[in-house]
Every structure is written in C-alpha cells, then in structure tokens.
Amino acid sequence: MKIKALSKLKPEQGIWMTEVDKPEVGHNDILIKIKKTAICGTDVHIYNWDEWSQKTIPVPMVVGHEYVGEVVAIGQEVRGFEIGDRVSGEGHITCGHCRNCRGGRTHLCRNTIGVGVNREGAFAEYLVIPAFNAFKIPDEISDDLASIFDPFGNAVHTALSFDLVGEDVLITGAGPIGIMAAAVAKHVGARHVVITDVNEYRLELARKMGVTRAVNVAEEKLEDVMAELGMTEGFDVGLEMSGNPAAFNSMLTTMNHGGRIALLGIPPSDMGIDWNQVIFKGLVIKGIYGREMFETWYKMASLIQSGLDLSPIITHHYKIDDFQEGFDVMRSGMSGKVILDWE
C-alpha cells in the first residue's frame, strides 16, 4: 500500500510530496497513524540543503520528527500500548547495548539514530517507531501541544538543567525553543527571565509568553536592562539557544561568578570565546542534546498539567497539501511553531 509523505527527494533546495510504501511493523514496534506534525528548525536546514544537511541527510528520505498520532498496530513483543492510544515519540532511537543505554543514561547513547534525519521520518500518513520511543499523551493535552513535545522537550531539558528557583536567567535566542525555555523558567519560579534576539516578531512572542524582558540587542544594551532590573551581580543561569558567537560571548560577560550555562544552540565549529570569563568566574558549561529519556517527557506533561500555557508559541496551521506555505513562513522567521494537519 502507498501512502503520502513529505520527502527529501533530491540533493538540492526543497522538500517534495511523494508516495512511499506504508512502513512494516517489527516485533518491538508500533505503527502510528499521524494526525499532526510540526516543522522544526532542523527540517528548515534540510529544506535549505545547507552544509550540515549535505553531510548528514540520506536522499531520498521521508523527513520530520515532531508529531502526534494514534496507535493503529502493535508488534507482538510490545507491552504497555493499546490500539487507539494517542502518542508522540522520542525522535532519538538508541541502541540499548552501549554503556550509557545500559546505565540508564539513554539520551547519551553514542549510537543514536534520528527519526527523519538518519532514517524515515514522521511527515507521512503512517510512522513506525520502536515502542520504547513512544510516549502516551494525557487526555487533557491537545493534539497541537502534543505535536510540539519534541522541541518543547529540548526547552525543558535545557531549562531544568540547573536550579532556577529565585534565580536570574538569561536566554540568548528567541526561536520557539528559546521562548518555551523562558516560559518554563518563569513557571518554575525564576526571578528575572531575560531573552535576547534581533528578530522583533519573535521577541514580541516571548513577551506574550510572560518573560520579564525581551531585549532586541540591535537596539538596546543588555547591561542597561540589567541595571534597570536592579541586577548588580550578573545572571545566575544562562541558556544559550542561538548558536550565535556574539550572543554566547555576551552571555559569558554578563554571567555572575559561579554561574551555570546550558548550551543547546549549535555554534560554528571554530567559535572563539574569552576563556578568561569561564575560568576566572568559575562558570559551569553543560552541553545539551535531545531530551532525557523519559524524565523530560514526564516533566513536559506535568508542566502543562500544572498550568504552563504554551499556546501563544503555535502561530500557524496548514493542511498538509499546503505544506509549502508552512515551510515558506518558517523560513521567513516570522512565525512561532507551524503545524501541518494530516487529517
């Protein structure tokens, strides 16, 4: 049987609607009928066919890894899932036999394979993934929110890396993940949550999500904002979401001594920084990749159930046949999360 899917068909700019074979369910897998998918920054890189994509993405391949759907078939070894369960899923498929997997640090598996990056993805009518990777969505969480659990998980993993209660938090990069991380920081009890960017559309989104200050660094100095907030000693926690060298260096300069930084943004490989800031301030820097399995997922559900409102971050909806409009608006930078409806 053939199904509709969005695929990277050619090694050039673009993504194409295609027909592919319906995937087969293995012993340990579940088959998910996709309801909604969201477009990730990674999908935009794949669309643009940038240097990273050219090195990483096999062609042809079905793309996408942010989704929600319904379980419609179950492999014979699978326990804990039933037909009709509403699920999203962890996009990092791990090996299960390396030291980190066996030691319970699954998110640090050295043999990780990415759904829609190294193997067939979720932008299709059906997706097969290992049942281990699926996560049941509580009834009170909407399909829209469930479809963005993957990037929300990046935000939660980064934000909750360090204690935030009563702390002053700087977030560099107001993309959707940065904005969600800011909302989490505020929700769990940070004092001042300041986010920086140069994209006024996204800074306005951050304001809607309740940050203390959203700062356009092209127009005002971070140091002036800190003075205005009565901050005399610098930020306690930094969440770097942009991969922008100037943003990271500005973070290092404005951190308090003993400050802690979680790094999710991917900088150019040869980024230079002022190491004196790190050493003489005694800063701690932690690299973040993916989500903790599955601690981050349970935290995500609990945060929403405890009143965290992410709805402003979802700005655009399109039917799947209009996917091109969705990619165009994502590439323009004038959007939050963009959702594609498969039903």
Curated annotation (Swiss-Prot):
NAD(+) binds at I177, D197, R202, L264, G265, I266, I288, Y289. It comes from the Bacteria. The keyword Metal-binding applies. One of its GO terms (molecular function) is L-threonine 3-dehydrogenase activity. It catalyses: L-threonine + NAD(+) = (2S)-2-amino-3-oxobutanoate + NADH + H(+). Zn(2+) 2 binds at C95, C98, C101, C109. It is found in: Cytoplasm. Gene3D superfamilies: Medium-chain alcohol dehydrogenases, catalytic domain (3.90.180.10), NAD(P)-binding Rossmann-like Domain (3.40.50.720). Keywords: Cytoplasm, Metal-binding, NAD, Oxidoreductase, Zinc. Its cofactor is Zn(2+). Zn(2+) 1 binds at C40, H65, E66. The keyword Transcription regulation does not apply. It holds the Pfam family ADH_N. Its EC number is 1.1.1.103. The active site is at T42 (charge relay system), H45 (charge relay system). GO terms for biological process: L-threonine catabolic process to glycine. Pathway: Amino-acid degradation; L-threonine degradation via oxydo-reductase pathway; glycine from L-threonine: step 1/2. One of its GO terms (cellular component) is cytoplasm. The record marks D150 as: Important for catalytic activity for the proton relay mechanism but does not participate directly in the coordination of zinc atom. Catalyzes the NAD(+)-dependent oxidation of L-threonine to 2-amino-3-ketobutyrate. Homotetramer. HAMAP family: Thr_dehydrog. Belongs to the zinc-containing alcohol dehydrogenase family. This is L-threonine 3-dehydrogenase. It comes from Vibrio parahaemolyticus serotype O3:K6 (strain RIMD 2210633). The lineage of its organism: Bacteria, Pseudomonadati, Pseudomonadota, Gammaproteobacteria, Vibrionales.
